[in-house]
Amino acid sequence: MIRRSLISRLALSALAASPLLVPGPLLAQDKPVLHVLVGFPPGVGTDNLARMYAEALGEALNATTVVENKPGAGGQLAAQALKQATPQSNSLMFAVDHQIVMLPLVTKNPGFDVKKDMLPVARIVNFFTCLAVPATSPVKDLEGFVETVKKDPAAAGNVGVPALGSQPHFLTYVLAQHYKIDLKAIPYRGAAPAITDLMGAQIPAAIVPCDALVEHRKGGKVRVLAVASDKRYKPMEDVPTFGEFGFKMPADSFLGVYAAANMKPELVKQVTEATRKMFESPKLVEKFASTQMEPAYAGPDDLRSLVEKNTAYWGEQVRRSNFQAQ
């Protein structure tokens, strides 16, 4: 009897220690949590894609992923937060290339160092930039745009861009130099207000992300003149590229993933491999493409090389334009 009682108590003790009986919240504590920083507000294209990525990463690693929006200063606040992240926070940043390439070029003190404070994980998509005019504009193509600006630069030469110091800002400069015309970049607080003014013909032209124009073009509200790339943009395959007009520039922009420099090396390796494997899933690749951006995986080394090339090119345009760092 004593023996049976002892065995019963031992059995109960073993069951109590079993993970199957541990309450849910305790189990959740053992599940890793990854924080994905996004430098833009909820609901915009970058945020939507970041949430798709975070969900896929969580499933791949059996982890909880938390998307944290830190909008402001063109993504600068999110990049600074990545630098300040602790190793225990398991922090990643879903970055637009403006944060990685342009901010260090146009900001006196960005508050982070791309080479020291973050590790490249992968490029996820390319996104394209378009030159567009209102649908009511008499301008029908790039040649017509150039001729119109030459005739009346004061009326036709203002070009809306998403931000001061952005790639579209300096693409305006490149266009002006190439065609020897007088263009003036008019900075907005993001692409959305620039597009609103474009559709209302409050501004004669704009250079903004193509994905933000797809539906407006279908609705007959804007006319897209050219895509800043050397290859055509699938949702607008009838629109010529700047490459077709003789431009040589690394104009494709990208969205990619960076890890905090102090993230545990084993976790960085796991995140990197999980991200690579995402592109083996046609369903997930199609989901990424639904954002009107182009799925375009590149690993850490290729992403690092891409950033170096783009930084060299845009850095030269910044210097030539005599832009004063803010």
Model-predicted segments: where are they?
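N-terminal secretory signal peptides and thylakoid transit peptides that target proteins
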Residues: 1-13
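N-terminal (or domain-start) structured segment
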Residues: 28-116, 158, 164, 180-207, ...
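Hinge/capping helix and adjacent helix->loop/strand transition within the periplasmic-binding protein
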Residues: 31, 84-91, 105-193, 242, ...
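An extracytoplasmic/periplasmic, membrane-proximal ligand-sensing/linker region
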Residues: 31-33, 178-179, 218, 265-326
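Solvent-exposed coil/turn segments that connect beta secondary-structure elements
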Residues: 97-99, 126, 136, 211, ...
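A ligand-binding cleft/hinge motif common to bilobed small-molecule-binding domains
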Residues: 99-108, 174-178, 205-237
